[in-house]
């Protein structure tokens, strides 16, 4: 019986696919630990999953807790899908940056704001990975990213694998999200778009966009329309610079680049879901628990649950492939570069389509404009250095990362270092490795 720990069991975007694959499709004997900061969500997730397991004849044991540290002992795998957005810490970052006139550095992923967010998230991630290396050293860690939360996926993967020695892979839904965005923009049906995205997490680009019915390349049309559309100023800028269409549910690549006239003044936090969505999820889990998925009421609740997440992000399928049970293809896998993405040194984490099977993980080669190669090499090195700084408390690595961070281009480094030092001091209880 495999033991699987789900950290962020109530994660809106990922829980449906995890539940479906574990208890409806796979149905193998499994011990599942549901971990969530919301104890009610953790319990409802466990009970809802138990109802699925019973209905579909899956032998399973369930536990729930709010403390991840209690769940990892002897685990066969850990799936991390918590959003990890510290809103209180983020607000403090924004206040300080606005006070000193660096409001455009209030970002979640790049620059000063991104550095602070990285250090907060990776302080926790280092604790988790260190514990895994001691208590379940052979267990893979699968980190999921919705694009809305506070986890910088590439840096988290670098931290867990490179710094802590835990085998780590990351999953995102950027291709699925980009398909929805561009189908709406081009006034087409999603199923008619053949799309591929690759690059780095939060810095992915459209590498293929075709009309399935007509078998025609849609990239020239999409670029032309965006360059003529005042609402797509950011996309147009990147098309001019790099000859590529930015991927994602919304254009966020600016967070990892220097400021321009068209880049937003600061990042606006978008969760993708609201309180009402989570309350509906809880209600549906309760209905599923009481009625089971085979009754009309339970079937309706399960139907609403299973269609409300990201359908392409399936960590259980990845685990089965790693365990040699069933090969799988992943649209957007964050993995150590094996040559699939040009410009990035081997071993640094990239985001690309990949195949996972008995013989390992293999990225599928993609073609990105040469204008992006050096930049992605620079950003991937930034990810490594920020991960090293956050996991070890190295201020030397932090300074080195800031020196090459494209988001800090044109900003006085000495002044910025002083500002960041003040921000760290104000939240030193969350950055124990630096103090």
Language-model regions, residue ranges each:
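Rossmann-like NAD(P)-binding element
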Residues: 35-40, 55-136
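Long, compositionally biased stretches enriched for glycine and/or charged residues
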Residues: 182-435
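A short helix-to-beta-strand connector/capping loop
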Residues: 53-63, 164-166, 191
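Extreme N-terminal starter segment of soluble prokaryotic enzymes
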Residues: 1-4
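Glycine-rich phosphate-binding loop and adjoining beta1-alpha1-beta2 segment
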Residues: 24-56
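Phosphate/oxyanion-binding active-site loops and adjacent basic polyanion-contact surfaces
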Residues: 11-15, 41-45, 117-124, 174-175
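Rossmann-fold dinucleotide-binding core
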Residues: 16, 135, 140-221
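Conserved N-terminal Rossmann-fold NAD(P)-binding element of oxidoreductases
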Residues: 6-9
């Amino acid at each position: 019986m495999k033991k699987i720990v789900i950290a962020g069991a109530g994660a809106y975007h990922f829980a449906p696919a995890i539940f479906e694959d574990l208890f409806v499709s796979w149905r193998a004997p499994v011990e599942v630990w549901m971990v969530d900061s919301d104890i009610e969500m953790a319990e409802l997730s466990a009970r809802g999953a138990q109802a699925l397991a019973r209905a579909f004849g899956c032998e399973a044991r369930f536990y729930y807790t709010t403390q991840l540290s209690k769940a990892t002992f002897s685990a066969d795998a850990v799936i991390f899908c918590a959003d990890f957005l510290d809103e209180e810490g983020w607000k403090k970052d924004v206040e300080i940056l606005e006070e000193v006139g660096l409001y455009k550095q209030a970002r979640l992923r790049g620059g000063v704001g991104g550095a602070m967010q990285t250090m907060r998230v990776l302080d926790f991630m280092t604790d988790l990975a260190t514990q895994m290396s001691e208590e379940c050293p052979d267990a893979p860690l699968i980190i999921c990213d919705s694009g809305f939360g506070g986890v910088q996926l590439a840096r988290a993967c670098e931290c867990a694998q490179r710094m802590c020695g835990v085998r780590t892979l990351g999953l995102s839904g950027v291709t699925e999200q980009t398909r929805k965005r561009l189908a709406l923009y081009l006034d087409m049906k999603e199923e008619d778009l053949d799309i591929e995205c690759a690059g780095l997490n939060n810095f992915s680009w459209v590498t293929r966009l075709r009309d399935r019915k007509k078998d025609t390349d849609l990239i020239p049309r999409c670029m032309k329309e965006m360059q003529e559309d005042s609402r797509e100023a950011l996309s147009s800028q990147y098309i001019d610079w790099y000859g590529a269409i930015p991927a994602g549910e919304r254009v966020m690549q600016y967070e990892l680049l220097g400021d321009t006239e068209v880049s937003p003044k600061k990042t606006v936090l978008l969760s993708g879901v609201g309180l009402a969505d989570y309350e509906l999820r809880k209600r549906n889990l309760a209905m599923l628990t009481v009625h089971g998925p085979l009754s009309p009421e339970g079937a309706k609740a399960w139907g609403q649950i299973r269609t409300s997440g990201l359908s392409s992000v399936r960590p259980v399928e990845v685990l089965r492939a790693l365990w040699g049970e069933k090969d799988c293809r992943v649209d957007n896998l964050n993995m150590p570069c094996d040559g699939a993405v040009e410009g990035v040194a081997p071993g640094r984490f990239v985001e690309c389509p990949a195949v996972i099977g008995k013989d390992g993980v293999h990225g599928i080669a993609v073609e990105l404009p040469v204008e992006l190669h050096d930049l992605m090499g620079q950003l991937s090195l930034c990810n490594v250095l920020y991960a090293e700084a956050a996991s070890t408390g190295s201020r030397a690595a932090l300074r080195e990362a800031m020196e090459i961070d494209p988001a800090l281009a044109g900003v006085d480094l000495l002044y910025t270092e002083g500002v960041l030092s003040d921000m760290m001091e104000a939240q030193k209880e969350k950055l124990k490795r630096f103090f």
